[in-house]
Amino acid sequence: SKRMQTLFDGGRGDEFHIYYGPSGSDMMYWPLLMQSMLHPGQTITNIVSCPEELGSGSILAAEGMYYANTNQYGEAVPKGDLVTDSFHVDVQFLPAREISGHIADRKQAIRDIIAARPGQPIVGNLVFGSKSGIKDDLDIIDEFREGVMWVVDMCQFRTHPALVHELLSKGVMLMVTGSKFYQAPPFCGALLVPKFWTELLTGQPAEHLRDYGRLFTAADAPPDLPQLRSIWPDHPNAGLRLRWEIALDEMEAYLSIPQEETDALIRRWSRVVIGRLALSDRFGMMPDMELTNDSIISFTVSAGGRELDYDELKKLFDTLVLGEHPSLNGYNRVFLGQPVRYGQRSFIRLALGSYSIRKLMEPNGFDPYNDLHVVDLIERTAIELFES
């Protein structure tokens, strides 16, 4: 916790607390639990932006349901069932993209939902860096500083410490993971919670959340909330803590490099890879790329004269990720972003992580050979699978 605070609030330790969970999807539960403690017996409105571009479990978690078949203890849990019936959630999903693929403007829909529910507990989940790098207009937060528990999904963590500090200072909670941009092992989630929210929860009853002990351990809640720690299993997740240590090592190394240098490298990489994609008729860039994060490139893939659908992209993804590729320079395996649906269409993604950026900035110079060769492999594999 102290290492994270040093990175994002200058080490003062008085700006936020850290709430843990085994994955980014588990972070969707925390605001619901908090609102149920602050407003017992009331229905919680949960506004969720860009659900199709969040983690695979986030949609079920947003409704207070188990999103997987196994919990962090290795026990079986009933995926799709409510974790508890002690509070009710009214979920309002706001799609990320129009049918055309263009990024949707969700601000007015959010205003309408809030206006229709005066006095009700509301959680507003925005995204800043979805699977395709979409960034919600965070100005909506300033319109409703009171009455909404704002949460920004930064699980990709492709942002600068200054924005993290700014949002926390506005009372906004931040969902983060160490396993996306910072390339730590998967299942590495945390929620950064402004300290005043924890203070509001102090002393609030929590017995109705006992069933959430099937998902969270006592150590996942901060010491300031003994009413939660006392009803959840005393079963510290050592693996989670180790994964965060790895993530923090990488964060410290990356953030020690001047921001203008890393930003320039990311822009250069993006131009080079997009240039390669543009050379082939089999690739189509997603609309509004200029509105997304430069370290994520989203594109459709075509073969046999037609655009591949989700299942075909999944087959392409599995073939590439599970196979070995000795033609790569120094490596023989690849990983890329899993397919994402929008309407009836789908796309895949290439993304640049912090470790990769640091390698590209080494004295040997900028060498995008492997990145360009991955595009070659995608094109070649699509032809083999769907044109032969």
PLM features per residue range, with description:
Residues 19-29, 51-56, 128-134, 155-158, ...:
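Gly/Ser/Thr-rich loops at beta-strand to alpha-helix junctions
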Residues 56, 63-100, 236, 289-291, ...:
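Low-complexity, serine/threonine/proline-enriched polar segments
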Residues 84-151, 158, 181:
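Active-site phosphate-binding strand-loop segment of PLP-dependent enzymes
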Residues 165-179:
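Conserved active-site segment immediately N-terminal to the catalytic lysine
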Residues 179-293:
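Active-site C-terminal subdomain of aminotransferase-like
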Residues 251-347:
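Conserved small-domain helix->loop->beta segment predominantly found in fold-type I
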Residues 339-388:
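PLP-dependent enzyme catalytic core of the Aspartate aminotransferase-like
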